[in-house]
Swiss-Prot record:
The keyword Lipoprotein does not apply. Transmembrane segments: none annotated. The gene is rpmC. InterPro entries: Ribosomal_protein_uL29, Ribosomal_uL29, Ribosomal_uL29_CS, Ribosomal_uL29_sf. This is Large ribosomal subunit protein uL29. It comes from Deinococcus radiodurans (strain ATCC 13939 / DSM 20539 / JCM 16871 / CCUG 27074 / LMG 4051 / NBRC 15346 / NCIMB 9279 / VKM B-1422 / R1).
């Protein structure tokens, strides 16, 4: 999901998206520990998406406070 798409999400959707990505990240970490990780690039991608979601969420919160 692109940051421009993230900015169109509702507040409740941010929590759902972050939780879904963290859950998938946890599953991939278990696979990596077991040596069965098929897509190692997905771990980095998920970490980046979680960070982007948190950043956009904070930006929107700051924008709401300023108005």
């Amino acid at each position: 999901m692109k940051p421009s798409e993230m900015r169109n999400l509702q507040a409740t959707d941010f929590a759902k998206e972050i939780d879904a990505r963290k859950k998938e990240l946890m599953e991939l970490r278990f696979q990596a520990a077991a040596g069965q990780l098929a897509q190692p690039h997905r771990v980095r991608q998920l970490r980046r998406e979680v960070a982007q979601l948190n950043t956009v969420k904070a930006e929107l919160a700051r924008k709401g406070e300023q108005q």
